Amino acid sequence: MARFRRSRSRSRSLYRRRRRSRRGGRQTRSRKLSRSRRRGRSRRRKGRRSRRSSRRSRRRN
């Protein structure tokens, strides 16, 4: 039972770290202002455009 408990605690910690890293990555733009902001904005804009285009195509069909 001890082994299972340890494995569960480790898996939970890994998931928490991954979630924190994602949220922190968005907030830690202060470290690399120009690079991270330009990349993030371009990716977000592309994603929004694709979503809008998909919605329009569905309505037309």
Curated annotation (Swiss-Prot):
Q: Kindly list the GO molecular function terms attached to this UniProt entry.
A: DNA binding
InterPro entries for this protein: Protamine_P1
Its localization reads: Nucleus; Chromosome
Q: Where is this region: Disordered?
A: 1-61
Q: What does the UniProt keyword field contain?
A: Chromosome, Developmental protein, Differentiation, DNA condensation, DNA-binding, Nucleosome core, Nucleus, Spermatogenesis
Q: State the tissue distribution.
A: Testis.
Keyword field contains Transferase: no
**Gene Ontology CC, one term:** nucleosome
Predominant location category? nucleus
Q: Does the keyword DNA-binding apply?
A: yes
Q: What does this protein do?
A: Protamines substitute for histones in the chromatin of sperm during the haploid phase of spermatogenesis. They compact sperm DNA into a highly condensed, stable and inactive complex.
The record's comment on protein family reads:
Belongs to the protamine P1 family.
Provide the protein name.
Sperm protamine P1
